[in-house]
Amino acid sequence: KEKKIKGMVYLSSMELYGKIEKDEFVSESELGYIDPLNIRSCYPESKRMCENLCACYAAEYEVPVYQVRLAQTFGPGISYEDKRVFAMMARKAIEGKDIILQTKGTSKHPYVYTAQAVTAIFTVLLGGKSGEAYNVSNPETYCSIYEMGKLVSEKVANGKIKVIVAKNGDISKYPVPSCLKLDISKIENLGWKPEHNLLWMYNRLIKTM
């Protein structure tokens, strides 16, 4: 506002959508349920609030601000100690150890390659509409946690490791199973297209871990 910027992008998240009941494409205008009493809800609730502030500044002060709702993003540069499930699977492939899931791995989400996320951000910054949000993902990567583990074990580790679901896994620290298939037609209308599948992303990731 004070610096008279030409444009800014707020990096939001697909977690903003909360719990979606349907296994169908979800557009930017659709939102699911977030339990305000769940302590983990602080993250998606904060994303919703920040997007609202961006929209308010765009409307009241004409600040050119755009929101991108990123799917889980990964590629070269991820730390070897990263705690996220995709990184854990990459480590297991490198170490030749079985992938142990504490849940059944039924949650389904899309992903996007890091470099593609960057091009999406610039696409929105240069061609998007101020105050609006844009989903960013590669629909071809949409799969369950278990399915992703099978891909890593069979294609990345060449069948040398297995995916095992723990019989007595501690599921208390994990979110309830969910599905979230992002509709990216809005950003595609700006000319952006996703390119890289999960196998390609994993191969690139592992080379740099």
Predicted features along the sequence, with ranges:
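Structural signature of beta-strand start/N-cap positions in the alpha/beta core
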Residues: 7, 64-66, 132
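C-terminal substrate-binding subdomain of Rossmann-fold SDR/epimerase-dehydratase oxidoreductases
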Residues: 93, 97-209
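Active-site helix of classical SDR
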Residues: 42, 46
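Conserved Rossmann-fold NAD(P)-dependent oxidoreductase catalytic core, especially the SDR/UDP-sugar
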Residues: 1-40
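Active-site proximal helix/loop that lines the substrate pocket
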Residues: 13-16, 72-78, 126, 141
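Active-site beta-alpha turn of Rossmann-fold NAD(P)-dependent dehydrogenases/reductases
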Residues: 9-12, 69-71, 137
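NAD(P)-dependent short-chain dehydrogenase/reductase
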Residues: 22-24, 55-109, 114-123, 150-153
